[in-house]
Amino acid sequence: MSDSLLPCDGCGQLATDEHIAKRLARLEWMTRFRPVHISALLLSAISPGRDADFLYSPSGEFTGEAGRVLQAAGISRTEKSTEAILVEFQRRGLLLTHVLECPIESTQAKDSSALLKARFPATLARVRRSFRPKNVVPISDLLDPLLRTASGLVDTGCRIVLNGERAFSLNHHATSETISALRQALTASHVAVQS
């Protein structure tokens, strides 16, 4: 048997068995809370490195990206179980996904732009054919260079909701203004968001 690594289907990085197992676990966690009808698909660039920052993690820590997404959706975490929080997110027709479904391995960090560019067409196809949301809401500024073509915005098969002309930047440096703007955009997009 060969020890050669093959590219991961979810991110394009060379993948170990552990890498594949982690990707499949995260897909399973997300699929459990996938709405039947997706009002807004929140599209992030790169899956967080820590499970605590991954929205659908059963740990329910909701730090990092997960916490910012819940804050923007107006979902309180006070005195609620992890499942109750994720069910509320699901009932509102919200789904969070990533162009790169796996965290960037430290050895491949310099290639993140190339990996995003290579994986983006497959993500768009998945949005159009599988997710079929009413709205796509990009939530990472890393997606800005990928959202436009010579003829305009990329084809997602639905409306793209932007923060002006750019993606909402919910990366680690997100401001309260950005989170508030995203909440307003979700409300204006007729997604059930509570203040």
Task: Label each PLM-derived region with a short phrase.
Residues 1, 166, 173, 191-195:
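Intrinsically disordered, charged low-complexity linkers and terminal tails
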Residues 2-160, 165:
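A polyanion-binding, active-site-adjacent surface
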Residues 169-180:
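Short, charged, surface-exposed secondary-structure boundary motifs
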Residues 179-195:
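A polyampholytic, Gly/Pro-enriched intrinsically disordered region
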